[in-house]
Amino acid sequence: VLLVAADPAFDGHDPGPGHPERVARLRAVAAGVAASGLEDAVVPLAPRDATRAELGRVHAAALADVVEALSARGGGVVDADTVLSAGSYAAAARAAGAGLAAAEALERGEGTAAFLGVRPPGHHATGSRPMGFCLFNNVAVTAAALRTGGARVCIVDYDAHHGNGTQEIFWDDPDVLYVSLHEWPLYPGSGRLDETGGGAGDGATCNLPLPAGATGDVYQRAFDEVVEPLASRFRPDWVLVSCGFDAHRADPLTGLALSAGDYGALARRARQLSPGPGRTIVFLEGGYDLDAVRDSVAATLPALVGEPAEPGEAPTAGGPGDDVVDAAQLRWSAEEA
């Protein structure tokens, strides 16, 4: 059983005409769910709002105050990328709570995995600042809640952009392993190979900054030689995935070269990092070509429940990035030694 979250509240966040992070993205997600061939396995999950206390585990109270105040007066501009409307606080609180609802449902044994079609996305939001289309850090809110119960959490982020907010929030936490595969150089400018965490969390952050044109075979090597060995040593209780479909070769904002077939393979590999069924939650982050989002969702969902995907785009190969994987493998194998 795959739990899939959707909610009308997400439509209430409107950053304005021409903004790439638009409501139509969720229509593409819904089309991908319909095309996945999992009609009999998908169970709707009703999200709930994250409370101020739950947001407060990762965000300063002032951040939530700003989002709520701007929404209450009909909207406003945080920065050139991050624009709010009257419904933005409600959408963001519901998006941040979707992962909490998913974790609660999975802990009750109600599903094998969960896919959360939420917006606004979250991984750029820092502890104190909304940015990069993101208001609250959805994956971080869920990880922090799981941590209160003593769980060790692995966050795998394969959005094309580095999740600077998630990295910052868990920078010194040894019980949250944050792994990001992203395009470099690209917004927001963080995520270098030598950014590995600090204090007690040194070694619990792993970045693989890949060049434009990187293909699925490079990602598979990264999982084989870096991500899986790291996760195996870390032994997570939960795996949370920041899944941006903007690494697809058709995406208008980025230069990576993945296909829908590659996204299916990535979801399968991410699920295999978890200790067993019912411990994987996938959060929608970026992805701005609607056809690519639809096709990538259709390939992702079967992988989360161990089903073969419908025939679609083949996995890709032949792009650059092996040198980055080589360097990361050398760095992290030295860490193991």
Q: Where in this protein do the model-derived segments appear?
A:
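Charged, often glycine-rich, active-site loop that binds/positions anionic groups
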Residues: R48-A72
